[in-house]
């Protein structure tokens, strides 16, 4: 793995040189086995993520090559989504990708159920959660295709102004 300068500027556009150095230092501290990639265990050692029920989904979204680990490039790309300098569209796409598990551009009933199940655990019975999912799909699905597109998701999130609260965790 090279130094910070070995990464194209476009992947680091939300971070200045000092921030990249700080992120590199943090990455190396998390990389306990010095493998140049963070395993699930190493990734979840971040205090910000230890209690997050969606940590596996965050890892899956960060892990763009699908190898089950997060290398420094993926770490920079992923954390840049939380930068206060990141744009609204990127933040919305990141949030959408947490739900779009199969990466087909839509949130299906099953995907919404799985992600909400991660969040609520056993606090709701499955039938109660399914009712919530069904109602959510009906409410958000403006074109009636039975799934939530990025546009439908974005419209709701923008109306709630949730995206303004997606700020840096690094």
From Swiss-Prot:
Subunit relationships: Forms a complex composed of a calmodulin-dependent catalytic subunit (also known as calcineurin A) and a regulatory Ca(2+)-binding subunit (also known as calcineurin B). There are three catalytic subunits, each encoded by a separate gene (PPP3CA, PPP3CB, and PPP3CC) and two regulatory subunits which are also encoded by separate genes (PPP3R1 and PPP3R2). Interacts with SPATA33 (via PQIIIT motif).
Name of the protein this chain belongs to: Calcineurin subunit B type 2
Note from the entry: This protein has four functional calcium-binding sites.
Entry keyword set: Calcium, Lipoprotein, Metal-binding, Mitochondrion, Myristate, Repeat
UniProt GO MF annotations: calcium ion binding; calcium-dependent protein serine/threonine phosphatase regulator activity; phosphatase binding
GO terms (BP aspect): calcineurin-mediated signaling
Region called Calcineurin A binding, residue ranges: 131-136
Cellular localisation: Mitochondrion
Gene this chain is encoded by: PPP3R2
One GO CC term, this protein: calcineurin complex
Function: Regulatory subunit of calcineurin, a calcium-dependent, calmodulin stimulated protein phosphatase. Confers calcium sensitivity.
Ligand binding (Ca(2+) 2): 100, 102, 104, 106, 111
Sites where the protein binds Ca(2+) 3: 141, 143, 145, 147, 152
């Amino acid at each position: 793995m090279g130094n910070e300068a070995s990464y194209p500027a476009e992947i680091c556009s939300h971070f200045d040189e000092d921030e990249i150095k700080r992120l590199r230092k943090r990455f190396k501290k998390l990389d306990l086995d010095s493998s140049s990639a963070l395993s699930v265990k190493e990734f979840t050692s971040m205090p910000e993520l230890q209690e997050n029920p969606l940590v596996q989904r965050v890892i899956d979204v960060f892990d763009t090559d699908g190898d089950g680990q997060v290398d420094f490039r993926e770490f920079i790309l992923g954390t840049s989504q939380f930068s206060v300098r990141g744009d609204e569209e990127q933040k919305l796409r990141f949030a959408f990708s947490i739900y779009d598990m199969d990466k087909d551009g839509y949130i299906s009933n099953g995907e919404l159920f799985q992600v909400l199940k991660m969040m609520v655990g056993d606090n709701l019975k499955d039938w109660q959660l399914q009712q919530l999912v069904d109602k959510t799909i009906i409410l958000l699905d403006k074109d009636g295709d039975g799934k939530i597109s990025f546009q439908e998701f974005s419209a709701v999130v923008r109306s709630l102004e949730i995206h303004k609260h997606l700020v840096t965790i690094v």
